[in-house]
Amino acid sequence: MATHVQGVIYLLPFDRPYRHASHYTGWVHSATFLQPRLGAHRDGVGARLMQVVGEAGIGFQLARTWDGDRYRERALKRQGGASRRCPICRQQGRRG
């Protein structure tokens, strides 16, 4: 049976939408790796979406984190509705 490695799931709302996307949901092994991972996203390293968002000059910020594994991250992505989970969007009345 596969072991589910617990880590940190994070939600990044974009300053403005990129095509259909207004958020990115990601995962890291532990909170220790979160800030370096965000730095990598800012540098355009890693997820293709974050690379093109950066190339388009679109900023982002960390809105929320959850404890969880890769399976939970994938489930959240499949469910959609990142703007409903995003405290920044809810506060601003913004919908992706």
Which positions does each model-derived feature cover?
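GIY-YIG nuclease catalytic motif and its immediate N-terminal context
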Residues: 1-39, 53-84, 95-96
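A short N-terminal helical cap/helix-turn-helix that marks the beginning
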Residues: 88-94
